[in-house]
Regions:
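Short alpha-helices
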Residues: 163-176, 308-323
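Short, ordered loop/turn segments at secondary-structure junctions
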Residues: 72-74, 82, 111-112, 137-140, ...
Length: 323
């Protein structure tokens, strides 16, 4: 596959009708009768049926196959807090993937609100429109509480894609990579660079699959997450290590079997990859720029099992695979 350039990406989004999604009718509309059934006066009848039995919304409207992809733009890909509007191309892209891979219709909704309570209120207010909510690109730790509350307070499915979608697909990749490497998950040493929603959820699923907490080292922007630190939230405390001999990624990666990167680009050097155990597994999943490029990782050592989140490199680990 050819490398994706800035020019090609901008042209793809702007050529023809701008954007990537549209709304199309599902019923006939060519005659006056069709239009009278679609809207007034015919539309009153399904309204009255739904008033009597709200479940009939699934019979008479698109609700059952309509998902809201909702974001406030505070953690967009590896770009960070770029704002609700700037994140819209990503939400449209997720809508496109829902449609082509799962046949699910999507409205992308960008909410310009960082306060968790107000964001929750906004989602709850529009929830009757949808059959499901897909939370997207919301920063940690707020995303954990937002998802928990919405699951408790809404009567439709709620999923935070960055947590659960990434966890499912990266875990599948890890299981396969361990088979190739001839290693067992309960024995491998795992280094996780990043401590946001995706990293936490991925690592929790690794633990449920058999990885041992004592074999896991997680890092955030301040370095190794250790029990000596006093600035940790609940999610980070769960993964805090007892080790006092490591503080940086360079120190933590020595002898590791697995590297999971959900942080930012170009933080893993070739020397770090060389310092890992035989047949190391490197999942450099930062987007759009991986923690180390595929070319650099493969050049560092021939036995590396390498994956990224990009579709223009081999071994893509991306939520879309789960659709």
């Amino acid at each position: 596959m050819a490398k994706i350039t800035k020019e090609a990406a901008l042209l793809y989004h702007s050529q023809g009708k701008p954007g990537k999604i549209e709304v199309v009718p599902t019923k006939p509309y060519s005659t006056q009768t069709d239009l009278s059934l679609a809207y007034s006066p015919g539309v009153a009848e399904p309204c009255l049926e739904i008033e009597k039995n709200p479940q009939d919304a699934y019979k008479y409207t698109a609700k059952g196959n309509l998902v809201a992809v909702i974001s406030n733009g505070t953690a967009v890909l590896g770009l960070g807090d770029i704002g609700a509007l700037s994140g819209k191309p990503v939400m449209e892209g997720k809508g496109l993937l829902f449609k082509i891979y799962a046949g699910i219709d999507v409205f992308d909704i960008e909410v310009d609100e960082k306060d968790p309570e107000k964001f929750i209120a906004a989602v709850k207010a529009i929830a009757p429109t949808f059959g499901g909510i897909n939370l997207e690109d919301i920063k940690a730790p707020e995303c954990f509480e937002i998802e928990r509350r919405l699951k408790e307070e809404l009567d439709i499915p709620v999923m935070h894609d960055d947590q659960h979608g990434t966890a499912i697909i990266s875990s599948a990749g890890l299981v396969n990579a361990l088979q190739v490497a001839g290693k067992k998950i309960e024995d491998v040493k795992i280094v996780v660079n990043g401590a946001g929603a995706s990293a936490v959820s991925c690592t929790k699923l690794y633990v449920s699959l058999g990885a041992r907490l004592e074999n896991i080292v997680m890092l955030d922007s301040k370095g190794v997450i250790s029990k000596a630190r006093t600035d940790l939230n609940e999610q980070k405390r769960y993964f805090a290590t007892d080790r006092t001999d490591i503080h940086t990624l360079e120190e933590a990666i020595k002898g590791a079997d697995v590297f999971l990167g959900l942080s930012k680009g170009n933080v893993l050097s070739q020397d770090m990859v060389r310092s890992m155990a035989p047949m190391p597994i490197v999942f450099a999943l930062a987007n759009p720029t991986p923690e180390i490029s595929y070319e650099d990782a493969m050049a560092a050592r021939p036995d590396v099992l390498m994956a990224t989140g990009r579709s223009d490199y081999p071994n893509q680990i991306n939520n879309v695979i789960g659709f």
